[in-house]
């Protein structure tokens, strides 16, 4: 799945994701892309083991957003895995 997100011309941004901390029955491994550029690979399988939300920021290289008013943020599960439960997706200034 993916989201089209507004950068407002900013280049010093992070992708902020909110995850549910307890996800014992899923194997959550996935890649995050910004306009088809790999931002990071994430493995949240059994990561927190808590019944709270967890927020993680991923710094976006300025060249991924330079000169753009919007970017597509795409989540792609690894083969045989899942993206997992994401409850918030935001672009934030660093």
Per-segment meaning from a language model:
Residues 1-12, 18-94:
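Beta-strand-rich ligand-recognition modules
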């Amino acid at each position: 799945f993916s989201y089209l997100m507004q950068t407002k011309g900013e280049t010093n941004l992070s992708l902020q994701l909110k995850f549910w901390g307890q996800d014992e029955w899923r194997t959550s491994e996935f890649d995050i892309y910004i306009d088809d550029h790999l931002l990071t690979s994430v493995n949240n399988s059994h990561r927190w083991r808590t019944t709270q939300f967890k927020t993680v920021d991923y710094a976006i290289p300025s060249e991924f957003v330079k000169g753009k008013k919007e970017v597509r943020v795409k989540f792609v599960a690894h083969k045989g895995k899942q993206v997992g439960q994401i409850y918030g997706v935001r672009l934030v200034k660093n």
